[in-house]
Amino acid sequence: MRFDEVGLFWNDSKPIKTRKEKIVRTPPDPVWLSPDYLPFYDEAKDWEPECMTNEELVDAKNRGDRLVWDTESYPNYWSAGFTNVRTGRCLIFENSPEFGLDFDKSKLDWVLRNFTLVDFNGESYDRHTAAIAIKPGTDASHMYQATQQIIEFGTPGWMVVQNFKARKIKMDHIDLIQLTPLAPSLKIMAGRLASSLMMDLPFKPGTYLTWEQMRIIRWYMFNDNRNTQLVYEAQFENIKLREEFGPKYGVDLRSKSDAQIAEAIFRAEVRKRTGRNPEPIPFTGSFKFKMPDWVQFKTPELQWLRQQLIDADFVVGDNGYVQEPAFCKDLQVPIGGMKYTFGIGGLHSTEKSIAHCIYNAAGERKFILRDHDVASYYPWLILNSGYYPPAIGPAFIPIFQEIFDRRQKEKKIDKKGVWALGLKIVLNGTFGKTSDPYSVMYYPPLMVQTTISGQLALFMMIERAYLAGMEVTSANTDGVIIKCPVERDADLKAIVKDWEAATGLEMEPNDYVATFSRDVNSYIAVDSKYKAKRKGWYKENGCNGRPDNEQIKKNPTAEIVGDALEAFFTRGTPIGESLRNCHDINKFVTVKQAQGGGVFVEPGSPPIYLGKAVRFYASAGSKGEIITVKKGHLVGGSEGCRPIMRYDGQFPTDVDYEHYANMVEEHLELLGFNTLTQ
């Protein structure tokens, strides 16, 4: 039944989805579990790290050099490896009573206490096994017991150290794992950052290692150090910002995510102002959304939505998260020729495979295509709500107001300055913590008040444009793109000004020449200077030689396709020219997670185990594919691929240019290019 039979909305019945069958192969025999499986042994057997002398070590300490480090733990082998970020010289500590390996515990203790160390998940794991390693009388078996307790049983590391009656080490270290959203594995990060070698742990945890396997593990450990250094270098500006901003509040922010920074600073401010150390306060039951007075609509559809939100009960589940009201499920709000999804997660338009351009077929400019982003959107809505997290108390409002005002002031002085960037992190991170049940910022009514008010404000803008006869081509959580005849520029500006007066918010406009949208989250927009803005699938990733905090959030997926599309849209470069003129293999690779581990299989060749993170490119000479080792599921996009876990500095001669050209053609259609040329 259609929604519009009983009300003002409709929800067209969706086509029946046919379940897409997973392509399943029979996994090969797991030769990689055999005792004689020795990957990279020829290199590892005689390899020795270039170690620092004691004099060099003291000099490095006096210079303030930083060391990246890692540990490896097996029942009969434990090691810790350190690499000087500045010089590349190393330290290694190994223990295996079975093979007569031991180390100077006092020296390891000195290193741990006298350097700034850089690690990946060191706060949860490495620092604790190292604390046990320096305790007199411990050996590899004890460190492995600790490893099992931390990793397999989930016991907090500090508790494991206590159980072993070991001494907690006072360490100065930077844990990189929290600096990238969703905390991807080091192996995935290596793929995003064009590591020369992506290598998974070569031997199953719990294996009693042979001498040959130990040589491989130590070689592998220093490859992990190289990859950790890649992440450190990619995050250097973020770390530098945290180092400069943290002391202003007396807080160490170096290992914290953006949201964690917001919480740490609020904790510090509350302690300073009230003497309290706030703790999370749970929220149970339900609550109502408080409709802002400024939210007003003229169309019956949006008036209906407004009333539904006034009447709705927002229920907090047993897990502490807000449940979507029933009326929001599958809701699509029609305004003009567009439908919009609406809910706690945000507002999104539903366009598919559509392009817009300001010129007609004769090359005459006929339209304005203007993107309007809301400035300081959620921070302003948080302040306007008047709500505060109970754990923080009323002090939240003046603290947040001061941070907001200081940010506005500093942004005018130096938008890239420490204060401006640091306060931006605090403002944006605050909202994320309002929905976290384990945070002192937790308060579901504040989260809902912020996100729903924001969506209603955007609906007010969309409605105004629609009633004025203009077209909204796209809208998401914090902005809208409006298309109108070029002679109506003044009308559009008047609409925006009227909206700003009604809501108290401010729009930041940006004009486009054209937009090409696969959907609301994946598109390429060309601005008035013919520079491209790429989002979603088309967004650049960390393999482009300019890694930053945005680009390392995304796995590489044949980035050459997005590059070729950008060159075609902005400069008219032929697709084939873009493909064949690129000699950077990073632009052609795809990096993916392979559940449980991936293996490359090709008729007539032995299987090659790749690991849980795989990297490959389309090969004109390959008949192989990558499948998961347990269930034989095909890793998507790997048919006819060639794995390239290691770079040798040479561009492959078998790149399948036809495959990539077909991908570009497919995405031209997905981006709606043919809607411009029809």
Segments predicted by a language model, with ranges:
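N-terminal accessory regions of nucleic-acid-interacting proteins
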Residues: 2-69
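Acidic, Mg2+-coordinating catalytic module of metal-dependent nucleases/exonucleases
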Residues: 118, 177-269, 285-288, 477-480
